[in-house]
Regions:
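Residues on the lipid-exposed face of transmembrane beta-strands in outer-membrane beta-barrel proteins
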Residues: 32, 53-57, 92-96, 112-116, ...
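Short glycine/proline- and aromatic-enriched beta-strand/turn motifs that initiate or cap beta-hairpins
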Residues: 10-58, 68, 208-211
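Short loop/turn motifs that connect adjacent beta-strands in outer-membrane beta-barrel proteins
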Residues: 13-26, 62, 99-107, 160-166
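Extracellular loop and loop/strand-boundary signature of outer-membrane beta-barrel proteins
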Residues: 37-41, 76-82, 136-142, 190-195
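Predominantly the C-terminal beta-signal and adjacent terminal strand-loop region
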Residues: 159-211
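Flexible, solvent-exposed coil segments and beta strand-coil junctions
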Residues: 29-35, 68-77, 128-137, 183-188
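Gram-negative (and chloroplast) outer-membrane scaffold detector with strong preference
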Residues: 63-133, 207-209
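Residues that define the transmembrane beta-barrel architecture of outer-membrane proteins
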Residues: 26, 47-51, 86-90, 106, ...
Length: 211
């Protein structure tokens, strides 16, 4: 019995030493999204252009605080009106490696993001009707808009060679800024979010390098 107790205490101490020996900070990665530029070029013939990069730190083999930022330009329409705008966006959040399996980069990831975007835009030929007045088409130039939303993300990353890795993310997006200010007309497109909807989705396929 004493031998069994000694063996248990030794194993526990060894496990504790192993856990304590994991460094907190384990490098920084930079990622470039390849999916959005290709998808939008094919889908909209270049009328929507969306570019983004991401930076994340690796902590304790499992946690990945992440900053994503980018720039988008869009020419699109709805109900006969036309939107032309450009602006930047940023997302801040953290990913968690689902499987705790040591120092490997290969893993499934889940995470959350808080995102915001600023843009300037023009809306032309917009259908407007007020009370009993007949509908008319109006133009709104030099509009400015701030939007924010939350995201739930899931995906995977795969180690390639000497710091190079690749992976993908699927995103579910929930728009928080749903109301317009007095005298403001909502944009049809939001950088980083996509077409303006209360719920939206997105996909990223990236290649990155960890330093």
């Amino acid at each position: 019995m004493l031998a069994s107790l000694s063996l248990f205490l030794y194993a526990r101490d060894e496990q504790q030493v192993g856990a304590d020996s994991i460094p907190v900070y384990q490098g920084l990665a930079v990622k470039l999204d390849l999916a959005k530029p290709i998808i939008e070029a094919a889908r909209t013939a270049g009328k929507i252009q969306d570019y983004e990069i991401a930076i994340n730190a690796r902590l304790l083999n499992r946690f990945y605080p992440t900053l994503e930022f980018g720039y988008a330009m869009a020419e699109c329409g709805a109900d006969g009106g036309q939107h032309k705008g450009h602006g930047g966006f940023a997302r801040l959040g953290v990913d968690l490696a689902v499987v705790k399996q040591g120092a490997t980069e290969n893993n499934f990831m889940v995470g959350i993001r808080f995102a915001n975007a600023l843009q300037n835009y023009d809306l032309t030929n917009v259908n407007q009707s007020v009370d009993y007045w007949p509908a008319q088409r109006l133009n709104f130039y030099d509009q400015f808009r701030y939007d924010c939303w939350g995201e739930i993300v899931a995906g995977c990353q795969v180690y390639l060679w000497k710091g190079l890795h690749m992976g993908w993310y699927g995103r579910i997006k929930l728009l928080m800024t749903r109301n317009a200010k007095i005298g403001q007309v909502m944009p049809y497109y939001v950088p980083g979010l996509g077409y303006r909807k209360d719920f939206n989705w997105g996909f990223n396929y990236y290649i990155g390098y960890r330093f």
